[in-house]
Amino acid sequence: MTETTARSIPLQIVQGDSPSAAPLQAGVKQLGGDKINRSPVQFADAPVLRKPSWIRVRIPSGNAVQNLKAKLRENRLVTVCEEASCPNIHECFGHGTATFMILGEVCTRRCSFCDVAHGRPKPPDANEPASLGQTVADMGLKYVVVTSVDRDDLRDGGAQHFVDCITAIREKSPGTRIEVLTPDFRGKGRMERALEILAQNPPDVFNHNIETVPDLYRNVRPGADYQWSLNLLKNFKAQHPDVPTKSGIMLGLGEDFEQIKATLRDLRAHDVDMITIGQYLQPTAHHHPVLKYWTPEDYKALEDYGYELGFSHVASGPMVRSSYHADVQAKGAGVS
């Protein structure tokens, strides 16, 4: 198999924020270098890998993208498609679908792969659930994904706001199926509180991304814990056995094939039903570099392995993202 890879990356490990880091102001976005410079993991210069031929995005014609953006701005809503610089934004917006990001545009974490802004968030917008519900109804969406930034500043991690959004969507658009893509609710007692709250009005699909293999967590997801994320998925499934669970993993951050397979086995052992596997693409020069472009043949092999493990649906390909064609994935898991 042909592969494009860099063998290693030098890391400079520092403790806490940079000494020159200015105090964070509520609602002010730290992006790119400003964000990553606050991370406990700093990346030395690494060679930039040339994107292979299979990393291509089709940009549709027409006004659908601008029309959807206008509708979102009109209702003061945010999509992770825009905030995280998703490469599939034109395709999804062109088909009138979007993944809504609630609880603001500022994340309390500083993950090295993510283009969402870091900082000190503002309090949740009490009007957001109603605005979201009305927008979903106005757009006639049959399937929506609702995600959020990490909110380590909130006692429940934002779980009540998720439930308020689910409730508002179901009130305004009863036929819409709802998938939530949640943060990890990490913190003393926070997972238990979050799961208790989510039980008030569970989604149709519960998604939480594992993101990468455990050996890379310190570099890729500082502030997160691999086993904690697995436990969140398993505990939700134990409480709601009829609700499909889902997770996702990115490739190209330094993992090897056996580590990926082991992570897939861990997810199945924690009762995850659906999995997405896609290529990591570096958002800016300040973020974690791409260390390898996995081939389409690799993704097919992982898809086959996922089905061997018993996943009800496996979406595996270079441009696959967690909420990309989420409605199709959900149908594969029996959500109708």
UniProtKB/Swiss-Prot annotation:
Requisite cofactors: [4Fe-4S] cluster
Subcellular location, principal: cytoplasm
Residue ranges constituting the Radical SAM core domain according to the UniProt record: 93-312
Cellular compartment(s): Cytoplasm
EC class: transferase
Disulfide bonds listed in the record: none
UniProt: [4Fe-4S] cluster 1 binding residues: C81, C86, C92, S323
Record CDD domains: Radical_SAM (cd01335)
GO molecular function: 4 iron, 4 sulfur cluster binding; lipoate synthase activity; metal ion binding
Residues that hold [4Fe-4S] cluster 2 according to the record: C107, C111, C114
Reaction it catalyzes: [[Fe-S] cluster scaffold protein carrying a second [4Fe-4S](2+) cluster] + N(6)-octanoyl-L-lysyl-[protein] + 2 oxidized [2Fe-2S]-[ferredoxin] + 2 S-adenosyl-L-methionine + 4 H(+) = [[Fe-S] cluster scaffold protein] + N(6)-[(R)-dihydrolipoyl]-L-lysyl-[protein] + 4 Fe(3+) + 2 hydrogen sulfide + 2 5'-deoxyadenosine + 2 L-methionine + 2 reduced [2Fe-2S]-[ferredoxin]
E.C. designation(s): 2.8.1.8
PROSITE patterns: RADICAL_SAM
Keywords assigned by UniProt, alphabetized: 4Fe-4S, Cytoplasm, Iron, Iron-sulfur, Metal-binding, S-adenosyl-L-methionine, Transferase
Database matches in NCBIfam families: lipA, PRK05481.1, PRK12928.1
PANTHER family reported for this sequence: LIPOYL SYNTHASE, LIPOYL SYNTHASE, MITOCHONDRIAL
The protein's name in its UniProt record: Lipoyl synthase
Organism: Stenotrophomonas maltophilia (strain K279a)
Gene: lipA
